[in-house]
From Swiss-Prot:
This is Endoribonuclease YbeY. Binds 1 zinc ion. It is found in: Cytoplasm. Belongs to the endoribonuclease YbeY family. Single strand-specific metallo-endoribonuclease involved in late-stage 70S ribosome quality control and in maturation of the 3' terminus of the 16S rRNA. One of its GO terms (cellular component) is cytoplasm.
Length: 155
């Protein structure tokens, strides 16, 4: 299985307590090589101010969010392994994990899996797309030895 090249950018005021680079690498490797042979992904971990600004600029949402995915569009006629960028907001991930009663590490893993699937073209706007994407997320999370991230919604 091929490995994903990771460019990890830690842009928080306090980067202590974040997952290790090897964890981010493991989570990416659980998703992307299933769909694409060679790829490069940037993961940027940010504070709420940067997440809020990006979410407002690119999605028109006036609040920070857990993960933003920016797929790279390869110009016609070119071959590149750059898949895109994930921007993950530390504070939102930590708050959601606490509110949802999930282990923090599992929620970080889920955000990387979820964002990676977006980079690969998956979406959850339509119900059938959401079901397909959530099923893939669950399968990958279980393969990583985490619980189904949607278990509370299924009960």
């Amino acid at each position: 299985m091929s490995q994903v090249i990771l460019d990890l950018q830690l842009a928080c005021e306090d980067n202590s307590g974040l997952p290790e680079e090897s964890q981010f690498q493991t989570w990416l490797n659980a998703v992307i090589p299933q769909f694409q042979e060679e790829s490069e992904v940037t993961i940027r971990v940010v504070d709420t101010a940067e997440s809020h600004s990006l979410n407002l600029t690119y999605r028109g949402k006036d609040k920070p969010t857990n993960v933003l995915s920016f797929p790279f569009e390869v110009p016609p006629g070119m071959e590149m392994s750059l898949l895109g960028d994930l921007v993950i907001c530390r504070q939102v991930v930590e708050k959601e994990a606490q509110e949802q009663g999930k282990p923090l590490e599992a929620h970080w893993a889920h955000m990387v899996v979820h964002g990676s699937l977006h980079l690969l073209g998956y979406d959850h706007i339509e119900d059938d797309e959401a079901e397909e994407m959530e099923a893939l997320e669950t399968e990958i999370m279980l393969a990583l030895d985490y619980e189904d991230p949607y278990i509370a919604e299924k009960e």
